Amino acid sequence: MRAVIQRVSNASVSISEKVCGAINQGLMILIGIEESDGPEDVDWLTRKIASLRIFTDADGKMNQSVCDINGQVLVVSQFTLHASTKKGTRPSFIRAARPEHAAPLYEGFIKSMNELIDSPVETGEFGADMQVQLTNDGPVTIWIDTKNKS
């Protein structure tokens, strides 16, 4: 399971020009699921993200988590995080999980994040063609792959 986490001052996701999820200060999370992912990846990744100290404290140091600042979270599914560009110029998405495997894990990720943070998690729509707008604060962008835990 891969995630691109961006510290944002605001972010929104739209489908057919209609906003379906929006946040102010917090985290914009793009989540990609592969066939070998399972519930243990969801648990590990949500705990890791919720505790990442990437927000500044009173001294200007990155020392606070999204929970510490009562921040918000926007989650958007993105199978292209598992693109392989080793051959040719057209990406292969063979490692990305099929929807019947990925959708329940995506929903589990959202449920788990909702249990870890105070404000409700905003989302896009799994598998939809979406437009994402955000203001990356910092900028701070972090990439995490659950297959690289150690």
Predicted regions mapped to residue ranges:
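A charged helix-plus-loop insertion that forms the helical arch/lid used to bind
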Residues: 87-101
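N-terminal, polar/charged subdomain of small-to-medium soluble alpha/beta proteins
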Residues: 1-89, 104-150
